């Protein structure tokens, strides 16, 4: 078939046709090489819902708007620190620096970590019990179980209320997940407060296991003593009472961190404190400034906000949406916000990609 066509074509037309094919192939190969030549930007995933959503939003913009590949690496707090120092991790969308104060100070001073600004303007992490434990819930027919419970000291009197089903003689504290720095801090605080003598400390193996343990207790109207944080869908959905601790003190917190790092014995410390309330920031490896300056500038501009991310997380929970679907919902419902982060050409690329994905935009 092809022989017949070429046999009746003038030589000059054959030459031109072949030249066009060669140029097209070379162009595709060059484009492929250019794309392959870009090292992917590595995002850390420390396994909680808000960072999954934030990663999806940022990675979509980077891949579609800046045409730069990205990847996600699941890491523990320790692995994240090592990876950022070595340059194996490029972006940490939720740098909870208050949980890593010593490392954060060293990393920013040495210069391999750049704090590019807040992703959420406020955050809270603390120890909680359901409000119905303290006040009851008339609609659900729940009587107050611990009407005098207010402080960490009071918890010593209520260990039997928060009974560990696997060890009925002791109470149970639901800690953060294994591998988080804050989980170790919580364990140290439990010991300093003297609560380790009354409670077993349970560390769920994943964020989903943590959420399931808490949500199932709330739905059943059962007593529960647990650690959690905001922004999250869970604290947006369930009514809680925060357990009072001594006010945050940077010197006291430094001692807690030294214990976690093995540089100080818990026996040498007799006080602990609440977590600091602050914003959550994005951390970027310094090499990204040269490798992808446009992406670096975008990350400096990107701020989702606490209320918007809470709405995204509520959407994920209510609609059983995955992080990618939640990101599309964010793009559709907070269009003015994300457009403000981007230069015009990148904004147009993102708009085209969202249109192809079926996202309806007003702009």
Language-model features, listed with the residues they occupy:
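Short helix-initiation/N-cap motifs at beta->coil->alpha
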Residues: 48-49, 69-85, 201-213
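Pocket-flanking alpha-helical
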Residues: 55, 75-112, 213-216, 233-238
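Short, well-ordered beta-strand elements
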Residues: 35-50, 68-73, 170-174, 299
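A conserved helix-loop-strand patch within extracytoplasmic ligand-binding domains
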Residues: 113-174
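A bilobed periplasmic-binding-protein/Venus flytrap-type ligand-binding module shared by bacterial periplasmic
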Residues: 125-142, 278-291, 312-315
